[in-house]
Each structure stands twice: as structure tokens, then as C-alpha cells.
């Protein structure tokens, strides 16, 4: 049995972005030489859960790749991807095959922060060619692929390691079957699970795992990664990091020119919201619903939040130095002059409140319609007529237009 206490390393020093607290904790876990049979990495999308899970699996089986081990490595494999005892699974739409999964795993081999989730990136050849798909772990996927992998004895490494991304997407039968595996672990098997939505998991699954919480990445961390790892210019990296919402994976694939076009639409949306032009509000909401993928719709919300934050900053300081959209200073000045009493903080809170609904597949056209109508009141320093708990009452405004 490998004695991990003797290893000298800095977890993820070659590849991982931010998450200093999580890195320190994983360092301590491995150096303690008390390895649990199951770990659950929990946190928002795009903060590096899969990347950390892969780096953890590599380190446990002695692979020097994402973490530098030098002469201490005890595997000849170059990464988790080629190691026979490390198996990674993603939830899949029913229409996709295992070959589609292998393509995506190869992308992760080259970039652990690549977007490979079927739900976010249905097509690898053309990111805009299809809408978002729902992806799950149905019982046949679990029975035919995951369970047999978990029964394998280590071939080369210390442990057989099963990484299951987005474990919350297990169907009920799959989750119950998986729980049986989790309840009766073998000594040479480790599960590493990730989730974007811990609340959706069976409590019995959570209780049998060591929980590793991960936070949204900080703006400077994303900015530096975009410059150092992805080759962005400093100005573009700063802008992208500010609108990232702490999601590095999504941000690194943004098209800067497309984002600026989105920003122009956001400014127009705020103008028609101020006028309560319901026809324009619902038309824009329908257009975003139809022509933007889920990540594009999230980018719109992030862009909107940053622009409103710029309004707040400029109103309070009168200094353009501290704003993100500095090239939009004329538009910002006009907004601040025309809506001096706007409840900008409440507008940002409204976005925070509605963003999870978008991530849970509520139709974007409804969410943006609700935003437009509520913004009308908040920009006039008034209480919205429809309470936040009754957002469904905005739906007739959409249907009637």
C-alpha cells in the first residue's frame, strides 16, 4: 500500500485555477494517508470540479500531470485519460452513444476546463448547431458501464477510481442502484463525484461521501488564467473575467465580439424596460429564448448584471476608472442622469434571484419578461406591482404579446 505521507507536491500546480482553500484541503487529505472511499465535489458550474476530480484521481494513482510529482511518480501513464484504473463518466442524452462520450473525454485530456457536458454543448462540431439537451444517467447506462467499471480490480495503480460528473443527473433507479455500491465499497475502489446541485442528491449519497465544497472563482483568478493559459489580451481578459459570474470554463469560450453585441442588446433591453414597451420586451425575450443556447442566456444575465453594477459605481463615484464597460461611458452617463433614483442594487438582486431558474431550465422568455417588467418599476424607484414570490403572474404579459 502506497504511503502518501512521504509525497512532496503542490496539488494541481500545473493546470488548476484558483480554489486555494480546496487545494490546501486536498493536500492535507492526501498527506494524512487516510483516504476515504468516496468524495463529493460540490459547487457552481465552471469552477473546476471535474478538473479537481481528475487531478485528485491522478495523484492517488501516482500520475505526474496536473500535479508535478517529478521522480516521486509511481505511474508511467501521462494522464488520467490513459490510466487503466481511472474511469470518468458524464451524463448522456438518450440519443448519444459511447463513442460520443470518448470524444469528449479526449477534449478533457487536452484541457481539463473544456466544456464537454452534453447539456451545455450538444455538438462538438458546431456550438450553435443545436439547442441544449437534457442529459442523465439512466439505469442501462449505470448497469452496462458504471457498475462493471466499479467491479474492476486495479490493473496498475493503487486504486480503481470512478469519477461520476454531475451525479445529480442520475435517474431514481440509477441512484438507488449506485447507493448499494456506495454502501458496500471494496478496499481498492474510490468514487469521486461532482455536482452542481447538491440539494438534488439523495441525503444517503451525501452522507456516505467526504464533501469538498468549491466556490465561484474570483475575478483576478479568471483574468490571470485567461491571460496565462488562453492567451487573451489583458483588456479582454479583464472584461471577460468581470462578466464571468465566477465560471471560468464558460468564460474561456466566449467570443469577445459576440459579447459586445450582446451588451448592445442589453442596453436596448434596459431602455425598453424603462419605457415598459411590452412588445419590445417580449420580442427580445423570445429572440434570446430561440437563438441563444443556455450558456448564451446566462452570458446575457451576467452582462446585464455587470452593466447595472457599472451604473451603480458611476452614480456613486462619478469616476469611469472603476467601471468595466468603460467604452460605454456615454451610455452609462445618460442612464445615470435619466434614472437618478433607480434602485440599482435591487435590480442586481433580481438578476441573482432569477438566474438559478434559468439554470434549472425555466424558459428564458419568461425570465427575461419578468426582468423587464420588474426593472420598469425599480428604475422609477417604485415597488413592483407583482411580488417576487408571484413571478408567474407576469406570464399573461408575455402571452398577450
Predicted stretch roles:
Residues 161-165, 178, 189-195:
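Structural recognition of the conserved hydrophobic beta-strand(s) that form the central parallel beta-sheet
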Residues 151, 176-190:
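Conserved catalytic/switch belt of AAA+ P-loop NTPases
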Residues 1-80, 187-190, 196-303, 307-401:
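Charged, glycine-rich active-site and insertion segments that engage polyanionic ligands
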Residues 169, 184, 200:
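Residues immediately C-terminal
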Residues 58, 105, 179-181, 210-211:
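Glycine-rich, phosphate-binding/catalytic loops in enzymes
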Residues 2-173:
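Clamp-loader machinery-focused feature within the broader ASCE/P-loop NTPase space
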Residues 148, 180, 207:
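Conserved adenine-binding aromatic site and its adjacent loop/helix in ATP-hydrolyzing domains
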Amino acid at each position: 500500500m502506497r504511503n502518501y505521507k512521504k509525497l512532496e507536491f503542490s496539488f494541481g500546480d500545473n493546470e488548476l485555477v484558483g480554489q486555494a482553500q480546496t487545494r490546501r484541503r486536498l493536500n492535507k487529505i492526501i498527506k494524512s494517508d487516510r483516504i476515504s472511499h468516496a468524495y463529493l465535489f460540490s459547487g457552481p458550474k465552471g469552477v473546476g470540479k471535474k478538473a479537481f476530480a481528475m487531478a485528485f484521481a491522478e495523484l492517488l494513482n501516482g500520475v505526474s500531470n496536473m500535479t508535478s510529482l517529478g521522480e516521486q511518480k509511481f505511474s508511467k501513464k501521462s494522464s488520467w485519460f490513459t490510466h487503466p484504473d481511472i474511469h470518468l463518466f458524464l451524463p448522456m442524452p438518450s440519443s448519444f452513444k459511447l463513442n460520443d462520450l470518448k470524444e469528449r473525454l479526449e477534449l478533457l485530456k487536452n484541457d481539463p476546463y473544456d466544456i464537454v457536458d452534453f447539456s451545455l454543448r450538444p455538438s462538438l462540431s458546431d456550438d450553435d448547431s443545436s439547442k441544449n439537451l437534457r442529459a442523465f444517467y439512466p439505469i442501462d447506462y449505470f448497469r452496462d458501464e458504471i457498475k462493471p467499471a466499479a467491479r474492476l480490480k486495479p490493473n496498475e495503480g493503487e486504486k480503481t477510481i470512478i469519477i461520476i460528473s454531475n451525479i445529480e443527473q442520475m435517474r431514481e433507479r440509477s441512484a438507488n442502484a449506485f447507493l448499494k455500491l456506495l454502501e458496500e465499497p471494496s478496499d481498492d475502489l474510490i468514487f469521486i463525484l461532482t455536482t452542481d446541485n447538491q440539494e438534488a442528491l439523495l441525503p444517503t449519497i451525501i452522507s456516505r461521501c467526504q464533501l469538498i465544497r468549491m466556490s465561484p472563482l474570483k475575478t483576478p483568478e479568471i483574468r490571470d488564467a485567461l491571460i496565462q493559459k488562453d492567451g487573451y489580451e489583458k483588456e479582454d481578459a479583464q472584461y471577460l473575467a468581470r462578466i464571468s459570474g465566477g465560471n471560468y470554463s464558460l468564460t474561456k469560450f466566449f467570443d469577445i465580439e459576440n459579447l459586445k453585441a450582446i451588451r448592445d442588446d442589453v442596453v436596448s433591453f434596459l431602455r425598453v424596460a424603462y419605457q415598459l414597451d411590452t412588445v419590445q420586451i417580449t420580442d427580445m425575450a423570445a429572440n434570446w429564448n430561440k437563438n441563444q443556447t443556455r450558456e448564451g442566456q446566462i452570458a446575457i444575465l451576467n452582462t446585464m448584471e455587470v452593466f447595472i453594477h457599472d451604473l451603480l459605481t458611476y452614480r456613486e463615484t462619478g469616476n469611469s476608472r472603476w467601471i468595466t464597460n468603460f467604452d460605454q461611458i456615454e451610455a452609462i452617463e445618460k442612464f445615470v442622469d435619466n434614472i437618478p433614483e433607480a434602485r440599482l442594487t435591487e435590480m442586481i438582486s433580481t438578476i441573482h434571484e432569477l438566474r438559478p431558474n434559468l439554470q434549472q431550465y425555466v424558459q428564458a422568455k419568461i425570465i427575461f419578461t419578468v426582468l423587464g417588467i420588474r426593472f420598469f418599476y425599480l428604475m422609477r424607484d417604485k415597488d413592483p406591482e407583482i411580488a417576487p414570490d408571484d413571478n408567474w403572474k407576469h406570464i399573461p404579459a408575455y402571452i398577450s404579446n
